[in-house]
């Protein structure tokens, strides 16, 4: 994985597209709130913002909330968003971005939903942005 990341950075430098303006949306998804910020490749990020999680709502409301948060953070990005990192509680299929939470009284409504495609469908401006799902600690 590290090799591919280095290869990608090198390509961006070679083709003149540069990564200096490329931004990443960072989300820490909790049951009560979602913390979010925007970062550049050097780790310089905006102030962390807090949003209500709506973890006990319907599928549509949860997905619309994720999309709304991404849109708000995109406005803070001075450049294009090339990636979205989501730290999210388990059980969760982190490789495929699919929630496996059931019976936890949070995010039950998004069980089995592929989050990347659902969020991109609601926020087409994310285009080819890559998603990375990580276990929250």
Language model: regions and residue ranges:
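N-terminal phosphate-binding loop and adjacent alpha-helix
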Residues: 45-80, 108-117
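Short glycine-aspartate micro-motif
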Residues: 24-28, 81-85, 132
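Short glycine-rich, Thr/Ser-proximal phosphate-binding strand/loop in the N-terminal lobe
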Residues: 20-62, 98-101
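Glycine-rich phosphate-binding loop and adjoining helix at the ATP-binding site
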Residues: 55, 63-64, 92-137
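Intrinsic-disorder-associated, low-complexity terminal segments enriched in Asp/Asn/His/Tyr and depleted
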Residues: 3, 8-10
């Amino acid at each position: 994985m590290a090799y591919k990341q280095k290869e990608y950075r090198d390509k961006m430098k070679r083709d003149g597209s540069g990564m200096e303006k490329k931004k990443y949306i960072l989300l820490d998804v909790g049951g009560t709130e979602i913390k979010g910020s925007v970062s550049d490749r050097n780790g310089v990020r905006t102030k962390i913002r807090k949003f209500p999680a709506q973890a006990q709502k319907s599928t549509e409301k949860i997905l619309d909330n994720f999309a709304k948060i991404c849109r708000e953070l995109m406005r803070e990005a001075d450049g294009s968003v090339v990636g979205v990192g989501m730290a999210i509680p388990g059980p969760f299929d982190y490789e495929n971005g699919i929630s496996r939470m059931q019976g936890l009284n949070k995010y039950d409504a998004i069980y089995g939903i592929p989050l990347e495609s659902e969020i991109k469908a609601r926020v087409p401006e994310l285009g080819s942005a890559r998603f990375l799902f990580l276990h929250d600690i």
